[in-house]
From Swiss-Prot:
Recorded GO MF terms: DNA binding; DNA-directed RNA polymerase activity; magnesium ion binding; zinc ion binding
EC number(s) recorded for this UniProt protein: 2.7.7.6
Cofactor: binding details: Binds 1 Mg(2+) ion per subunit.
GO annotation terms (biological process): DNA-templated transcription
Positions annotated to bind Mg(2+): 489, 491, 493
Swiss-Prot/TrEMBL cofactor(s): Mg(2+); Zn(2+)
Subunit structure comment from the entry: In plastids the minimal PEP RNA polymerase catalytic core is composed of four subunits: alpha, beta, beta', and beta''. When a (nuclear-encoded) sigma factor is associated with the core the holoenzyme is formed, which can initiate transcription.
Family: Belongs to the RNA polymerase beta' chain family. RpoC1 subfamily.
GO cellular component, one term: chloroplast
Main location: plastid
Protein name according to UniProt: DNA-directed RNA polymerase subunit beta'
Swiss-Prot/TrEMBL keywords: Chloroplast, DNA-directed RNA polymerase, Magnesium, Metal-binding, Nucleotidyltransferase, Plastid, Transcription, Transferase, Zinc
Summary of the function given for this chain in its UniProt record: DNA-dependent RNA polymerase catalyzes the transcription of DNA into RNA using the four ribonucleoside triphosphates as substrates.
């Protein structure tokens, strides 16, 4: 359906019997009305044609083959000159066979039936509206007991009792024995009520606005009483207040949507289109049918039996009629939600029947599998791995996925560059994986963003845009800083990749969805691209080192890891001479040559033109030389000054990890400054 804001939407709700008839009924040229399914049959075992008025009837649901009726006659579809549109012999309409995907039928129930979703699901809407315990309502629906009708003026058999106690169930064994079907119906219609018809009467008599006013008044009275001092009573009062709030909200919803509460009790049962519950012929001539068909057959069998008891047989005891009504109620319950009342119904092979609820709910249901989470074109899926060398707005796309996603774009590129004369030649070159194919693929990918999505998509950052680049392997490479927005990590998580095709979608991806434009949380405004997990561990490993500073002297075994520089003094003490480097390039070169470790302490000559934070600490020691120069020794660095107190050089005590970390930060700051200068 389409609402007033032109949004396409699907709305599930209660429907009136008149609307069900409108969906299903058709009037034939001879005046006959079709739409009601009265027979529990599917196909004739000899002709393999649908049975008339059965679950696959062509008169009700449309022809199996487009434009061909059950007699075999053919009419051109959509030709207004050819008349009539219905076959005069079989009554089948000459329309497209796709009508069997949406044309519905209905079953006219011999007795009202309560919709089990609104009775047994929690919270029970029927119990909330009637303000009665669910257990008592179940006993009423399944004919375990009854209640008296309030007759004001006329004398009654039950001696004017305004209600029938639920505990008194002796009527179940005594009253029906004194009446035939006709007599018992007269008595029941006048004085007592049971089954779903009793629920329907009570729902029809409800005044929703009065329910809201009374519930609000009771809620205020409970609020004014305050705590009783008894924990049990306080909990009971709290549960009652919560129930009153739910009851008022439910009544307001019925008023707002203009839906009558008695619609929760069914008089007509809709029959799904046959294409949604097919019967398929498999190898060996065997037939495979949907479980929905068998459940519909069960309902029709029991409903027809009840109809016969009420119309044809005049000597059947009333108790048998009520038992048959209970069987009809249970059959409809099994069709709608098998197993909701306890043990599920099974077939001859001890397999549980798949009811209507099982078809639509869950991960493999109709909505999530074929409507919301269905597979779409121009999409792929793979495991994500970390790409530490990637930019924040880039992602690594495996060649196998990229060539499949951009298949049509590569074909167009091959034809435009006159490398292939037609689509067939272009496809053959792609299958052969010619080198020119990868070059064109890279050109196409440079101007086309992709969308990465990780389920479940709980907020806006669950799907972001990236600039793809080709990588080897079969996993999608991702920058670790964007993982928090996806709530992802690299322990086997999978992501879906989609290609925005239209110009509007590409513009939206570039302007709003790129990862480097979503650095803040849209909910609270805090930074969301922050180091987590692997990055924190990597930063810790990079910056770990000798925390004791220069106080760790040569006799301290803390520095034992520089095995190449170990020395033994006269007292047989092992100590390490810390290496000295004139530049960071020399230190990194020594690390690559495995002369030092990542966290090994070393001395590094610091350039005076580099940024230096002025120290506020007092030197640990000052060493003076004969030429007037002196050394100020601090915890992690050493300053050499001349006679005029001018800094001659600075030596810092650091590690290779800290040097690498500093270089990365310095490059990032320089890149940010260049970007700011370009923008101004």
């Amino acid at each position: 359906m389409i609402d007033r804001y032109k949004h396409q939407q699907l709305q599930i709700g209660l429907v009136s019997p008149q609307q069900i008839i409108t969906w299903a009924e058709k009037i034939l040229p001879n005046g006959e009305i079709v739409g009601e399914v009265t027979k529990p049959y599917t196909f004739h075992y000899k002709t393999n044609k649908p049975e008339k008025d059965g679950l696959f009837c062509e008169r009700i649901f449309g022809p199996i083959k487009s434009g061909i009726c059950a007699c075999g006659n053919y009419r051109v579809i959509g030709n207004e000159k050819e008349d009539p549109k219905f076959c005069e012999q079989c009554g089948v309409e000459f329309v497209d066979s796709r009508v069997r995907r949406y044309q519905m039928g209905y079953i006219k129930l011999a007795c009202p039936v309560t919709h089990v979703w609104y009775l047994k699901r929690l919270p029970s809407y029927i119990a909330n509206l009637l303000d009665k315990p669910l257990k008592e309502l179940e006993g009423l629906v399944y004919c375990d007991f009854s209640f008296a009708r309030p007759v004001v003026k006329n004398p009654t058999f039950l001696r004017l009792r305004g209600s029938f106690e639920y505990e008194i169930q002796s009527w179940k064994y005594s009253i029906p024995l004194f009446f035939t079907t006709q007599g018992f119906d007269t008595f029941r219609n006048r004085e007592i009520s049971t089954g779903a018809s009793a629920i329907r009467e009570q729902l029809a008599d409800l005044d929703l606005r009065l329910i809201i006013d009374c519930s609000l008044l009771e809620w205020k009275e409970l609020g004014e009483e305050g705590p009783a001092g008894n924990e049990w009573e306080d909990r009971k009062m709290g549960r009652r207040k919560s129930f009153l709030v739910r009851r008022m909200e439910l009544a307001k919803h019925f008023i707002r949507t203009n839906v009558e509460p008695e619609r929760m009790v069914l008089c007509l049962l809709p029959v799904l289109p046959p294409e949604l519950r097919p019967i398929i012929q498999i190898d060996g001539g065997k037939l495979m049918s949907s479980d929905i068909n068998e459940l519909y057959r069960r309902v029709i069998y029991r409903n027809n039996t009840l109809t016969d008891l009420l119309t044809t047989s005049r000597s059947t005891p009333g108790e048998l009629v009520m038992c048959q009504e209970k069987l009809v109620q249970e059959a409809v319950d099994t069709l709608l939600d098998n197993g909701i009342r306890g043990q599920p119904t099974r077939d001859g092979h001890n397999k549980i029947y798949k009811s209507f609820s099982d078809v639509i709910e869950g991960k493999e249901g109709r909505f999530r599998e074929t409507l919301l989470g269905k597979r779409v074109d121009y999409s792929g899926r793979s495991v994500i791995v970390v790409g530490p060398s990637l930019s924040l707005h880039r992602c690594g796309l495996p060649r196998e996925i990229a060539i499949e996603l951009f298949h049509t774009f590569v074909i167009r590129g091959l034809i435009r560059q006159h490398i292939a004369s037609n689509i067939g030649v272009a496809k053959s070159k792609i299958r052969e994986k010619a080198p020119i194919v990868w070059e064109i693929l890279q050109e196409v990918m440079q101007g086309h963003p992709v969308l990465l999505n990780r389920a479940p998509t709980l907020h806006r950052l669950g799907i972001q845009a990236f600039q793809p680049i080709l990588v080897e392997g079969r996993a999608i490479c991702l920058h670790p800083l964007v993982c928090k927005g996806f709530n992802a990590d690299f322990d086997g998580d999978q992501m879906a990749v989609h290609i925005p095709l239209s110009l509007e979608a590409q513009a939206e991806a570039r302007l709003l969805m790129f990862s480097h434009m979503n650095l803040l949380s849209p909910a609270i405004g805090d930074p969301i691209s922050v180091p987590t997990q692997d990055m924190l561990m990597g930063l810790y490993v990079l910056t770990i080192g000798n925390r004791r500073g220069i106080c760790a002297n040569r006799y301290n075994p803390w520095n034992h890891r520089n095995s190449q520089n170990e020395k033994i003094d006269d007292n047989n003490h092992t100590y390490t001479k810390e290496p000295y480097f004139c530049s960071s390039y020399d230190a990194l070169g020594a690390f690559r040559q495995k002369r030092i470790n990542l966290d090994s302490p070393l001395w590094l000559r610091w350039r005076l033109d580099q940024r230096v934070i002025a120290p506020r600490e007092v030197p640990i020691e000052v060493q003076c030389e004969s030429f007037g120069t002196y050394h100020e020794i601090y915890g992690h660095y050493l300053i050499v000054r001349n006679v005029n107190k001018k800094i001659f050089c600075i030596d810092i005590r650091t590690t290779v990890g800290l040097i690498s970390f500093y270089r990365e930060i310095e490059e990032a700051i320089q890149g940010f400054c260049r970007a700011c200068s370009y923008s101004t």
